[in-house]
């Protein structure tokens, strides 16, 4: 039950932070490539929602894996695009005012939230494994 609660909570916070970041992308504007948009739509938005739903069902193990993998994917995507590759999507290329302020704050917030989300996914998988070993 706690796994589902924590996983759902982090998925909601993740969606809000990424939604605000996406809004900043639109308003500045900082367009994404088609491949980036596909990744964001599937890995960053859709899969965490599916994971949160599955955590409440008999498929909670799959939900835990999806949560861990989507959060890890989101971390890698954000690290590369916002802090490594110099492009219009890099935090150093966006003014720290107006929508740029929201962009930069949410870029950092997303890393923190996704780190927590990956940690929750890992913790969930470890708990599931321990429960199954205890049942043997």
Describe each PLM feature range.
Residues 17-25, 69-88:
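C-terminal TM-helix exit segments that contain a strictly Trp-centered aromatic cap at the helix terminus
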Residues 17-37, 88-99:
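Membrane-interface interhelical loops and short amphipathic "cap" helices
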Residues 12-16, 35-58, 62, 69-76, ...:
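Core segments of alpha-helical transmembrane spans in multipass integral membrane proteins
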Residues 26-33, 60, 83-90, 125-133:
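Transmembrane helix-loop junctions in multipass membrane proteins, especially transporters and channels
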Residues 95-114:
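Individual transmembrane alpha-helices with interfacial aromatic-anchor signatures
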Residues 54-56, 80-81, 122-126:
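Juxtamembrane cytosolic interface motif at the C-terminal end of transmembrane helices
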Residues 1-15, 120-130, 136:
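Cytosolic juxtamembrane helix and N-cap/initiation of the first transmembrane helix
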């Amino acid at each position: 039950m706690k796994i589902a609660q924590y996983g759902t909570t982090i998925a909601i916070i993740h969606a809000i932070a990424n939604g605000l970041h996406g809004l900043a992308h639109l308003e500045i504007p900082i367009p994404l490539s088609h491949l980036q948009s596909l990744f964001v739509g599937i890995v960053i938005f859709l899969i965490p929602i599916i994971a949160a739903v599955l955590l409440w069902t008999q498929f909670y193990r799959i939900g835990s894996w999806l949560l861990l993998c989507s959060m890890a994917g989101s971390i890698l995507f954000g690290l590369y695009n916002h802090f490594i590759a110099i492009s219009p999507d890099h935090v150093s290329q966006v003014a720290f005012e107006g929508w740029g302020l929201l962009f930069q704050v949410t870029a950092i917030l997303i890393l923190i939230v996704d780190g927590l989300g990956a940690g929750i996914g890992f913790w969930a998988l470890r708990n599931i494994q321990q429960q199954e070993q205890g049942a043997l």
